[in-house]
UniProtKB/Swiss-Prot annotation:
Statement: the UniProt record of this protein carries the keyword Cytoplasm: yes
GO cellular component: cytosol
Record carries keyword Nucleotide-binding: no
Annotated GO biological process: spermidine biosynthetic process
Organism in which the protein naturally occurs: Helicobacter acinonychis (strain Sheeba)
Protein name: Polyamine aminopropyltransferase
Limits of the PABS domain: 1-249
Family label: Belongs to the spermidine/spermine synthase family.
InterPro entries in the cross-refs: PABS, SAM-dependent_MTases_sf, Spermi_synthase, Spermidine_synt_N, Spermidine_synt_N_sf
NCBIfam families (alphabetical): PRK00536.1
Matches recorded under HAMAP family: Spermidine_synth
Compartments (UniProt record): Cytoplasm
Length: 262
């Protein structure tokens, strides 16, 4: 059997699978989990694939991209996604994580897929809310948006960010869809003075790019090497990965230079 991943509207990848382990459907999402000899378990959430053996790559990158550029990380907001492993990484900073996800049926169906599902859900520093309005009013050190936000959402989330806070969002991969990345950078640039694209170096199974945005905190100039060295139990993230994530080939530098703010 095969499953197909849409990388772009014109590019697809196929993966051999052995069996379907789970099929759960809600009003807004479809989650299927498959067994694969090559990649362990593979989750297909709508059109996106998650590889259980490689979950740590994105969660480590996004958590520590924010955590290692901020002196203090006390309050974090995660929206528009299901990745509880991201919260697990953020707990290394003794931070409080607000996690907004309305689809509890799908979230709970990841119980055997996310290695730290129970540890995160039962952590005293974790708050799960169905809607953002259910949370206490506060300002955040870091906001992670796990889907590409439109300008309206960027504006709303920015209002909850501390003056030196960091906003990280998912975007299209700049090599695969540079026009989409241009537009995402342009939208973010209307609200922040630092706006820089990055990717996950050496991650071969992803079609995602990301954007790091802030009013004051720079992802390279404000990098705190001592915090990186102090991290324990990480398998992907280090200082070299952090810096390499922002490296762009010459042609992309030319294409995106009008929209990058560094």
């Amino acid at each position: 059997m095969w499953i197909t991943q849409e990388i772009t509207p014109y590019l697809r990848k196929e993966y051999t699978i052995e069996a379907k382990l789970l099929d759960v459907r809600s009003d807004h999402n479809i989650l299927e989990i498959f067994k694969s000899n090559d990649f362990g378990e593979i989750a297909m959430l709508n059109s996106q694939l998650l590889f259980k053996n490689f979950l740590h790559i994105e969660s480590e990158l996004l958590a520590h991209m924010g955590g290692c550029t901020k002196k203090e990380l006390k309050e974090v907001l995660i929206v528009d996604g299901f990745d509880l492993e991201l919260a697990h990484q953020l707990f290394k900073y003794d931070t409080h994580v607000d996690f907004v996800q309305a689809d509890e049926k799908i979230l709970d169906s990841f119980i055997s897929f996310f290695p730290h599902f129970h540890g995160v859900k039962n952590n005293k520093n974790f708050t799960h809310a169905k809607q953002f309005l259910d949370l206490d009013i506060k300002k955040y050190d870091l906001i992670v948006c796990l889907q590409e936000p439109d300008k309206h959402k960027i504006d709303g989330l920015k209002r909850t960010l501390k003056e030196d806070g960091v906003f990280i969002s998912v975007a299209k991969h700049p090599l695969l869809e540079h026009v989409s990345m241009q537009n995402a950078l342009k939208n973010m640039g209307e609200f922040f003075s630092i706006v820089m694209p990055f990717v996950a170096p050496l991650r071969i199974l992803s079609n995602k790019g990301y954007i790091y945005a802030s009013l004051k905190t720079h992802p390279l100039k404000d990098l705190i090497a001592q915090k990186i060295e102090a991290l324990k139990n990480v398998g992907y993230y280090n200082e070299d990965i952090h810096r390499a994530a922002f490296a762009l080939p010459k042609n992309l530098q030319e294409i995106l230079k009008e929209n990058i703010k560094s």
